[in-house]
C-alpha cells in the first residue's frame, strides 16, 4: 500500500502550476451541473436510476474549452467535471426521496414543499457530503491507491489524459445528445409514433408484454452493462409473467386489500399498481438492507480508518499542492453550523434529535458510500438502500419519542433526503478526488468546486421537481418516481401500521431467495418494481453492449480497439441520456405552459413503426462503436 502511494507520480507534478480554478471552469462547470442535474432528475424519476456524469462532463469540457475557447488545461477540465458531476449526485439523492412530500400534498395531507425547503435540504445534504469526504481522502484515495480501483474516477482520468492527445470524443457525446433530443421530441412532443408499445396477453390473464422505445433507456442499459440489465429484466419478468398472472388466477372475483375492486376486472397495469408495487417495495427495501449487512465488516474498517484520519489531519498550507485539503477547523465549523441550522431553522421540519441523527447517519453513510464506490463504482452504489435504512431507523426513533403523524412523516423524509444526498455526493466526491489524484489536481480546489456544483444544482433542483410534477405528476406513467413512492409507503407503514405487510413480506422473501442464489438483489428488485416495458428498453441497450463485449481480440492492437469501441458507445449513450433528459424537461415546460398540444402531429404511425425506429437507433449505436476512427481513439 505504502509502495503504491510513494511510487505514484501524477500527470501534473505538485511543483508545476497550471490554470485550474478559473472563471471559465466555474461558469462551464455550473452550467453542466444544472444540465446534468435536470437530465438525471428526469431519468431517475422515470426509470429509478441515474448514471455518473463525470465522463460526459469531462468530454464536453474538453470539447468546449479546446475547440470553442482555444484553451487547454487538463486541471481546468478536471475542475469542470468535478463541478458538473455534482449536479447528477444532488439529483440522485433528491429524486429518491423528496417527491414523497409532493405525493402527500396531492393526497391533501400536507402543503407542497417550498422551493426554499427543497433548496436547503439539497444544499445541506450536498455540503455535508463534501465535508465528510475531506478527512477520508488521505485514507481512501492516497493510502489505498492501487487497492481500491475507483472505476469511474480512474476512467475519467483516462479520458482526460487521452484528451491531451486530441480527438473527437466531444463530437460523439454531442451527436448522441442531439439524436436523443430530436427522437424524444418526435415521439413524445409531436407524437408521430408512440414511445411505448405493449399488448395485454388475453390467453394469459394478468400479463402484458411491452417495451418503451426511448434512447435514454437504451443508454442506461448500455452503460450499466448486460449483467445489471438482465437482472432488471429478470425481476420484471417475475412480476409481470409470474406474480401478476397468479394474482389474477387465484384472486378472480375477490377484492383483496389494498385493492378496492374485484381482481378479475383489473387490467395488468392496475394489477401492477395495486399489488406488485408493494411486493417490489419489499424486495427493494430488503435488498438495500442486505447490501449494507454484507458490507458491514468493510463499513466498520472504513469507519475506524476515517476516525483515525480525522485525528491525524492537520493544517495543510505547507503540504505539496497535490496534498492540500480544506483545513479541518473549517470543515468542523461548517458541519457544526449546518447541524445547528437544521435544529433551529423552522424551514427544516426536524427536531434537535433529528439534527443529531443527520450528523451521525451522515458521516456513517458518507464513509460507507466513499468506500463502496471505490470498490464497485458509483453506478452500483446502493444509495437508496442507505436511505431506506436511515428512514426505518429514524422513523422508529421519531415514533418512539412521540413525533408521529404528518410531522413525524415529514421529519423522516427530510432526514432520509439529506442522508441520501450526503451518500450520493460523498461517492461522487471520492471519484472526483481519485481523478484529481491521478492527473495532479489540487484537492482543496476540487473540494471547493464540488461545493460550487452542489450550490448550483441545489438551487435548480426544486424548480425541476416542481416543473415535472406540474407537467405529469409524480407516480404517473411518465414519471413513476419508484424509490420516492416506496419511501412514502415505508414511512406511512411504520407510522400508521396501514401497509399490506403480507405483500411486502412476499417481496422480502423473494429478495432473500435471490440473494441465496447469488444474484445481486437491488437491480433484480428494481426490475420487479418498475413497469416491464422499462426493463425491456434497458435490456435492449444491454444486449448491444453484450454483443460488443463478445467480439474476439486476437492481439494487443485488437484488444485496444475493442476497448475504444466500448468507450465510443459509452460516450454516445451518455449523450443519449442527457439529450432525452433535457428534452423531457423542455416538454414539461411546454405541458405546464399548455402549448404542448399545438405541435402534435395529425398523423400517428403504428406501433410497429416505433419498434423499427428503435431497432435502427440500436443498429446505429452498434455500427458507431465498431467503426474504426483514429480521431476518437
List PLM regions with ranges.
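Alpha-helical multipass membrane-protein architecture
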Residues: 1-633
Amino acid at each position: 500500500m505504502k509502495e503504491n502511494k510513494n511510487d505514484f507520480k501524477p500527470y501534473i507534478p505538485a511543483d508545476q502550476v497550471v490554470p485550474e480554478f478559473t472563471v471559465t471552469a466555474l461558469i462551464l462547470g455550473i452550467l453542466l451541473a444544472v444540465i446534468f442535474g435536470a437530465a438525471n432528475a428526469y431519468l431517475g424519476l422515470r426509470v429509478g436510476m441515474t448514471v455518473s456524469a463525470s465522463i460526459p462532463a469531462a468530454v464536453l469540457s474538453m470539447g468546449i474549452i479546446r475547440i470553442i475557447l482555444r484553451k487547454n488545461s487538463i486541471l481546468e477540465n478536471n475542475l469542470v467535471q468535478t463541478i458538473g458531476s455534482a449536479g447528477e449526485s444532488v439529483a440522485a439523492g433528491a429524486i429518491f426521496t423528496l417527491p414523497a412530500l409532493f405525493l402527500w400534498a396531492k393526497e391533501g395531507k400536507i402543503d407542497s414543499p417550498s422551493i426554499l425547503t427543497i433548496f436547503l435540504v439539497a444544499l445541506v445534504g450536498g455540503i455535508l457530503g463534501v465535508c465528510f469526504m475531506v478527512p477520508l481522502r488521505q485514507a481512501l484515495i492516497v493510502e489505498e491507491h492501487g487497492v481500491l480501483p475507483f472505476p469511474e474516477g480512474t476512467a475519467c482520468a483516462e479520458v482526460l489524459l487521452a484528451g491531451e492527445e486530441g480527438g473527437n470524443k466531444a463530437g460523439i457525446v454531442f451527436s448522441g445528445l442531439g439524436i436523443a433530443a430530436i427522437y424524444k421530441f418526435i415521439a413524445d412532443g409531436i407524437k408521430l409514433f408512440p414511445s411505448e408499445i405493449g399488448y395485454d396477453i388475453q390467453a394469459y390473464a394478468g400479463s402484458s408484454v411491452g417495451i418503451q422505445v426511448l434512447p435514454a433507456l437504451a443508454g442506461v442499459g448500455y452503460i450499466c452493462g448486460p449483467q445489471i440489465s438482465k437482472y432488471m429484466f429478470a425481476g420484471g419478468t417475475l412480476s409481470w409473467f409470474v406474480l401478476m398472472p397468479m394474482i389474477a388466477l387465484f384472486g378472480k372475483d375477490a377484492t383483496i386489500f389494498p385493492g378496492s375492486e374485484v381482481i378479475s376486472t383489473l387490467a395488468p397495469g392496475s394489477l401492477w399498481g395495486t399489488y406488485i408495487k408493494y411486493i417490489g417495495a419489499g424486495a427493494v427495501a430488503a435488498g438495500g438492507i442486505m447490501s449494507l449487512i454484507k458490507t458491514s465488516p468493510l463499513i466498520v474498517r472504513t469507519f475506524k480508518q476515517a476516525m483515525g484520519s480525522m485525528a491525524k489531519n492537520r493544517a495543510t498550507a505547507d503540504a505539496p499542492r497535490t496534498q492540500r485539503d480544506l483545513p479541518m477547523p473549517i470543515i468542523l465549523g461548517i458541519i457544526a453550523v449546518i447541524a445547528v441550522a437544521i435544529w433551529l431553522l423552522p424551514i427544516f421540519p426536524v427536531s434537535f434529535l433529528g439534527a443529531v441523527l443527520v450528523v451521525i447517519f451522515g458521516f456513517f453513510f458518507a464513509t460507507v458510500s466513499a468506500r463502496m464506490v471505490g470498490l464497485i463504482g458509483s453506478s452500483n452504489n446502493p444509495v437508496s438502500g442507505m436511505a431506506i435504512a436511515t428512514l426505518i431507523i429514524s422513523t422508529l426513533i421519531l415514533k418512539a419519542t412521540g413525533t408521529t403523524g404528518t410531522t413525524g412523516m415529514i421529519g423522516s423524509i427530510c432526514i432520509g433526503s439529506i442522508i441520501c444526498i450526503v451518500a450520493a455526493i460523498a461517492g461522487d466526491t471520492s471519484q472526483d478526488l481519485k481523478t484529481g489524484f491521478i492527473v495532479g489536481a489540487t484537492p482543496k480546489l476540487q473540494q471547493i468546486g464540488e461545493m460550487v456544483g452542489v450550490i448550483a444544482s441545489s438551487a435548480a433542483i426544486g424548480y425541476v421537481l416542481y416543473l415535472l410534477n406540474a407537467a405529469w405528476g409524480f407516480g404517473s406513467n411518465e414519471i413513476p418516481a419508484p424509490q420516492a413512492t416506496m419511501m412514502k409507503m415505508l414511512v406511512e407503514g411504520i407510522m400508521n401500521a396501514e401497509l399490506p405487510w403480507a405483500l411486502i413480506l412476499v417481496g422480502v422473501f423473494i429478495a432473500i431467495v435471490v440473494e441465496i442464489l447469488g444474484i445481486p438483489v437491488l437491480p433484480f428488485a428494481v426490475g420487479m418494481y418498475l413497469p416491464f416495458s422499462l426493463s425491456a428498453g434497458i435490456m435492449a441497450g444491454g444486449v448491444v453492449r453484450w454483443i460488443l463485449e463478445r467480439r474476439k481480440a486476437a492481439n494487443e492492437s485488437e484488444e485496444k480497439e475493442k476497448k475504444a469501441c466500448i468507450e465510443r458507445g459509452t460516450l454516445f449513450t451518455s449523450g443519449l441520456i442527457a439529450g432525452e433528459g433535457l428534452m423531457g424537461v423542455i416538454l414539461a415546460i411546454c405541458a405546464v405552459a399548455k402549448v404542448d398540444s399545438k405541435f402534435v402531429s395529425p398523423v400517428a404511425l403504428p406501433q410497429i413503426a416505433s419498434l423499427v425506429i428503435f431497432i435502427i437507433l440500436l443498429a446505429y449505436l452498434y455500427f458507431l462503436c465498431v467503426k474504426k476512427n483514429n480521431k476518437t481513439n
